[in-house]
Amino acid sequence: MKIGFWPRLSAIASLGILMLLSFNLQPVVAQVPNIPDTDRPLDAPPLLEPPEDLLDRTNPALPSNEIDSPDETLVFTVNCYLIEGSTVFSQAALAEVVAPFTGEVTYAEVLAARSAINQLYLDNGYLTTGAYIPEQTLADNTVVIEVVEGEVTEIEVTGLQRLNPGYVSSRIALATEKPLNVPQLQEALQLLQLDPLIATINADLAQGTQPGENILRLEVREADSFNAQVDLSNDRAISIGTFRRGISVTEGNLWGLGDRATLSYNNTDGSNVVDVSYRVPLSPRNTTLELRYLNGLNRIITEPFEELDIKSRSQYWEFNLRQPIVQTLNQELSLGLIFSHQAIETSILGVPFPLSDSADINGRTKVSALRFVQEWVYRSPQDAIALRSQFSWGVDWWDATINETTPDSRFWSWRGQFQYLRLLAPDTTIIFRSTVQRSDRALMGLEQLSAGGLGSIRGYPQDFLSSDNALTTTLEARLPIFRNSQHLLQIAPFFDWGTFSNNGDNPNPSPQNLASVGLGLAWQGGENLFARLDWGIPLVDANIERDRTWQSQGLYFTVGISF
């Protein structure tokens, strides 16, 4: 029996669909504070609205079966269906879908088998894929159903000024592999919308010249990639002056590659630090390489040591390769490999002099290390969780310090960080964060974990003590007391605690435990102004020298403006 089931092109469901994917994403406003980390701060991305609320998409209706066909009352035998062209589903899965339409069937039931294949693709998000029944002669009572899987053959990007169009198209292309899955494409567009270089994306998916072919047109508006910030804080050690003045300038798209360059300068009465970094994307999967260089000069300004002109010069180099493994709208898992090298030289009255057991006779200390980093961030409209793990192996590269008995560049340590945020009500949050460090031997001061002051245990001076092993925790609530469209004022009661110990011949710090309670006052003025004042009350006596600095009284402040 010969049957003519030639479809018109318009009868292939979704082979020529036109859909608008226009949207303007607005992240949920929930500020996730950074986990304190002197090596590599962890910034949690903004929380997102549920994906189904972010994208307005209209699905076209399935076409009617108005094709030239035999008498629909004609009955014939179909033992099986041969589905050709499908790369998504197994033959067993397809056979199960069309099984109800075997045996003694009518032409209408054969069309229903084709529609069942179409529906299977639609239900799984393959909206531009269609099935049809070609003209054929029934052999062995087998009906052939052809599947034309949809694909994007061209991505057109318009509207960009400085950003390379390939930055956008290469990332979206990862979600347009054949067969095209529209929900996956939507999620890729939403993820790209979160990129700080992108302000808005309008997407249009249109029919190509051949069945199954589609053209994706993207109209992109760039975000402002330049940022500058000035801030003041008393977050430095008393010995070099607590009052810090800082300025930083960042260009997030320096050469149009999505490459980020940052230059910052900070100083106190006894210190000057210049920090330069450059990060460039290496692949559409957001592989990045970051290079960082830091140069600092510190001078002791507290009595009676000021007269001795005690100075330290430091240089720090870092090479950071980072690769996200999982990226979705509500979580990210990434791995990183870091090589760092730090060199410090100390002197008294201009003469090189060792100020630690690890330094050589010329006061030089050098540490080289390989670090393996794992980061995981999860966020929802109500919660955010951030985890960071870092394994560090000290190596004797780049003329690193090697000693017989005292701590040197050969070591192993692990540092873990955890942060949890819960949004209880608008602008009302509770935050818990913790940092732990363990090492296999006595460490040089450069690798120890410091505690005290902002970002650690408030109520004690900044960097009050350091140790090889440590555990610190903070519990803080943020409660609004005044807010309007431009300003938000919050109080922040907190509790900080930590315990510390050393390895080998390094004596344990005294005291080994620190704890404090206190109250913070945080103000946010629009998007550019911020200020915070914290007052910490130490619960463990630590023989703190009470001088005229705010820090020695347990008071800490930060004021800043960005533009």
Residue ranges and their predicted role:
Residues N234-R236, N253, Y265-D269, Y293-R299, ...:
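Transmembrane beta-strands of outer-membrane beta-barrel pores
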Residues K2-G4, A30-R236, T242, I247-S248, ...:
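Periplasmic polypeptide-binding modules associated with outer-membrane biogenesis and secretion
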Residues A203, F226-R236, I247-E251, L257-D269, ...:
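Transmembrane beta-strand segments that form the barrel wall of outer-membrane beta-barrel proteins
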Residues T288-R441:
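Transmembrane beta-strand segments of outer-membrane beta-barrel domains in Gram-negative
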Residues F226-A228, W255-A261, P284-L289, N298-R299, ...:
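Repeated loop/turn-to-beta-strand initiation elements of outer-membrane beta-barrel proteins
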Residues Q31, I402-F563:
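C-terminal transmembrane beta-barrel domains of outer membrane proteins
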Residues E251-W255, S277-P284, R322-T328, R371-Q382, ...:
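Outer-membrane beta-barrel proteins
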Residues A228-V230, V249, A261-Y265, L289-Y293, ...:
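Membrane-embedded beta-strand positions of outer-membrane beta-barrel proteins
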